Amino acid sequence: MDKLVDHFLSDQSRTMNEDLFSATSTELCYENLNRSCVRSPYSPGPRLILYAVFGFGAALAVCGNLLVMTSILHFRQLHSPANFLVASLACADFLVGLTVMPFSTVRSVEGCWYFGESYCKFHSCFEGSFCYSSIFHLCFISVDRYIAVSDPLTYPTRFTASVSGKCITFSWLLSIIYSFSLLYTGANEAGLEDLVSVLTCVGGCQIAVNQSWVFINFLLFLIPTLVMMTVYSKIFLIAKQQAQNIEKMSKQTARASESYKDRVAKRERKAAKTLGIAVAAFLLSWLPYFIDSIIDAFLGFITPTYVYEILVWIAYYNSAMNPLIYAFFYPWFRKAIKLIVTGKILRENSSTTNLFPE
């Protein structure tokens, strides 16, 4: 029997006996149950710090991505096929903050799962669905940016609202179908039945994934990653070439003769740069986790608990990063936030507000 267990996107409750902060004693998750999992509680100080750090991440993911979705869906100036992809990506990150991070906070700090066996499986499915949905969205966004930068004049006719809708539908359907079917058919536990039986206890949320499915999970992350790296490499080369062409003209000539195509290309390059940073942040956040998952599966479950928890929460925190990236690089997003938080969004005709002043 294959005795290697991997966590399907961070949803296994490991005993917290190797934590960064020392535990005070060993207890049971449910004191009156013989089949209860063992927990190692933190002392009050570290416990409060961890709740604050994890809770802040969840709140930022929920509020920040809610602002992104509200901005794009409310203001008509932002109604574009590319921005609809960004709004859908924000929805995935919003759902991570709402349905995954709060429960994982309790699991990570308390060392126990108190939300029932049914939601344990849902929680795992949500993690898988939202993670893969995010990477598929980012992959489509990179293709969108490549078309916009390489051929800005024909871009509006090539990447239409219909194309954007198909990309969004594909990203969500494939992610949800894959994650839920994998866990609810039990395919992930094939060959691990005896080990699962030994590990099962009340207050745990253990999801066993055999080597075959760990490898498939890794491929679902790796293939879109390679596509994005290739596409953004081409975008970088195109942007560099366009910049060199502009530099060949004198400043005075450039002001007089700068074409509509040049202005559009400049705007699209800036958007590509910002979204490229979002892609890089996603890859840097999730790549260590996926590398660790495949190492664990094939080398015998060797990752220390505290290392695993750090990798999981780095990945979770990515859901809170995109709104910060947009706020830093997009003046229109900062203006939209101001209109939303001051309540001006409730005024009549606020949806027609100009977010791009000259």
UniProtKB/Swiss-Prot annotation:
Domain-level remarks: In addition to the well known disulfide bond common to G-protein coupled receptor 1 family, trace amine-associated receptors (TAARs) contain an unique disulfide bond (Cys-37-Cys-201) connecting the N-terminus to the extracellular Loop 2 (ECL2), which is required for agonist-induced receptor activation.
- Outcome of gene disruption: Mice lacking Taar2, Taar3, Taar4, Taar5, Taar6, Taar7a, Taar7b, Taar7d, Taar7e, Taar7f, Taar8a, Taar8b, Taar8c and Taar9 show no visible phenotype or behavioral deficits. They however show an absence of aversion to low concentrations of amines such as 2-phenylethylamine, isopentylamine, N-methylpiperidine and cadaverine.
TM helices/strands, residue ranges: 48-68, 84-104, 122-143, 167-187, 213-233, 275-295, 310-333
Q: Which residues are glycosylated?
A: N34, N210
Task: Report the record's disulfide bonds.
Answer: C37-C201, C120-C205
Q: Name one GO cellular component term.
A: plasma membrane
Gene3D superfamilies named among the record's database cross-references: Rhodopsin 7-helix transmembrane proteins (1.20.1070.10)
Q: What is this protein called?
A: Trace amine-associated receptor 7a
Describe tissue expression: Specifically expressed in neurons of the olfactory epithelium.
Q: Which organism is it from?
A: Mus musculus
Please give the function described in this protein's UniProt entry.
Answer: Olfactory receptor specific for N,N-dimethylalkylamines trace amines. Trace amine compounds are enriched in animal body fluids and act on trace amine-associated receptors (TAARs) to elicit both intraspecific and interspecific innate behaviors. Ligand-binding causes a conformation change that triggers signaling via G(s)-class of G alpha proteins (GNAL or GNAS).
Q: What keywords tag this UniProt record?
A: Cell membrane, Disulfide bond, G-protein coupled receptor, Glycoprotein, Membrane, Receptor, Transducer, Transmembrane, Transmembrane helix
As for subcellular location, the record says:
Cell membrane
Q: Which Pfam families does the entry mention?
A: 7tm_1 (PF00001)
Q: Could you tell me which residue ranges are on the Cytoplasmic side of the membrane?
A: 69-83, 144-166, 234-274, 334-358
Lipid bilayer topology: Multi-pass membrane protein
Which family does this protein fall into? Belongs to the G-protein coupled receptor 1 family.
SMART domains in the record: 7TM_GPCR_Srsx (SM01381)
Give residue spans on the Extracellular membrane side: 1-47, 105-121, 188-212, 296-309
Task: Name the principal localization, coarsely classed.
Answer: membrane
Q: Which GO terms describe its molecular function?
A: trace-amine receptor activity
Matching entries from InterPro entries are given as: GPCR_Rhodpsn (IPR000276), GPCR_Rhodpsn_7TM (IPR017452), TAAR (IPR050569), TAAR_fam (IPR009132)
PANTHER family assigned to the protein according to its UniProt record, in alphabetical order: HISTAMINE RECEPTOR-RELATED G-PROTEIN COUPLED RECEPTOR (PTHR24249), TRACE AMINE-ASSOCIATED RECEPTOR 7A-RELATED (PTHR24249:SF78)
